[in-house]
Amino acid sequence: MPKLGMQSIRRRQLIDATLEAINEVGMHDATIAQIARRAGVSTGIISHYFRDKNGLLEATMRDITSQLRDAVLNRLHALPQGSAELRLQAIVGGNFDETQVSSAAMKAWLAFWASSMHQPMLYRLQQVSSRRLLSNLVSEFRRELPRQQAQEAGYGLAALIDGLWLRAALSGKPLDKPLAHSLTRHFITQHLSTD
């Protein structure tokens, strides 16, 4: 009989091991055996909890997107009466949270983005994450701008966030957070300026 609470512990171990494997060898070369070995479990445990490698990869992407959502929401909840500018900066901060810009997370996101073009479930998860970002940004810009301008500003800021993140991920160097925050802050203030 399995120990109570082991499922969540095992799932966490396997997701962490998957991120480590993707970080070291890439998603396509990360085998079930390597992941199980890193987690200190048998390969049968992966089948038990996730069916197969694709199920484990899907759970890993869900975990990363959940961490992104939490990073953004935690910052927004700290600013319930904050200005649109502060709340937009909070959304940016959540997207540049350490859970999203660590080497393992960046490599996993790149692998998932590439795989999402061929795997419907990963595509849906990617679309949910992308739409959530755009919706959050437009909603905050909408507090101070007409609808069309808010949509354009939200789309532009989403593109800037993704672009800064992608450049860092592909450079193999850590994200320059001060530069990223400076550029996004300038974009935000430029679009919210009433001059």
From Swiss-Prot:
GO terms for biological process: glycine betaine biosynthetic process from choline; negative regulation of DNA-templated transcription. Residues 31-50 bind DNA. One of its GO terms (molecular function) is DNA-binding transcription factor activity. Pfam families: TetR_C_6 (PF13977), TetR_N (PF00440). Keywords: DNA-binding, Repressor, Transcription, Transcription regulation. Gene3D superfamilies: Tetracycline Repressor, domain 2. InterPro entries: BetI_C, DNA-bd_HTH_TetR-type_CS, Homeodomain-like_sf, HTH-type_TetR-like_transc_reg, HTH_TetR, Tet_transcr_reg_TetR-rel_C_sf, Tscrpt_rep_BetI. Pathway: Amine and polyamine biosynthesis; betaine biosynthesis via choline pathway [regulation]. Residues 8-68 form the HTH tetR-type domain. PANTHER family: HTH-TYPE TRANSCRIPTIONAL REGULATOR BETI, HTH-TYPE TRANSCRIPTIONAL REGULATOR RUTR. Repressor involved in the biosynthesis of the osmoprotectant glycine betaine. It represses transcription of the choline transporter BetT and the genes of BetAB involved in the synthesis of glycine betaine. This is HTH-type transcriptional regulator BetI.
